[in-house]
């Protein structure tokens, strides 16, 4: 398997599959994918600029889990099994690096069905 084959396989993965891959690599090689602390300090200095990309995080499914699963499927385009895994495993990141408008729209749809959502 060539490097290009590996990259192509990664490109075809969903966010959920990529998250599982990162966790498996961390466990297998005893490393962490977290950014070094020095980098986080440098980013904090530029935080005065307005943020343009946001992460949408499902904090809790609330009481109406079935409606939340349907909303997650609609928002992410995932299958029933994957959407259920995300809802059952909350808190989970639904989408990363989306516009403020898209993040607020997702938050509104999920809040409408009773989910607790964070936009970071």
UniProtKB/Swiss-Prot annotation:
Keywords associated with the record: Ribonucleoprotein, Ribosomal protein
Annotated GO MF terms: mRNA binding; structural constituent of ribosome
Keyword Isomerase: no
Coiled-coil boundaries: none
A Gene Ontology term for the protein's cellular component: cytosolic large ribosomal subunit
Recorded superkingdom: Bacteria
Purpose of the protein: Forms part of the ribosomal stalk which helps the ribosome interact with GTP-bound translation factors. Is thus essential for accurate translation.
Family in the record: Belongs to the bacterial ribosomal protein bL12 family.
Descriptive protein name: Large ribosomal subunit protein bL12
Gene that this sequence comes from: rplL
């Amino acid at each position: 398997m060539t490097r290009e084959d590996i990259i192509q396989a990664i490109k075809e993965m969903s966010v959920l599959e990529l998250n599982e891959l990162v966790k498996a690599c961390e466990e297998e090689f005893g490393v962490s994918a977290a950014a070094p602390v020095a980098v986080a300090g440098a980013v904090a200095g530029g935080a005065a600029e307005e943020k343009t990309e946001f992460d949408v995080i499902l904090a809790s499914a609330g009481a109406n889990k079935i409606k939340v699963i349907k909303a997650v499927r609609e928002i992410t385009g995932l299958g029933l099994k994957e959407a259920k895994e995300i809802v059952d495993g909350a808190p989970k990141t639904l989408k990363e690096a989306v516009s403020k408008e898209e993040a607020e729209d997702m938050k509104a749809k999920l809040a409408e069905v009773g989910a607790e959502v964070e936009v970071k």
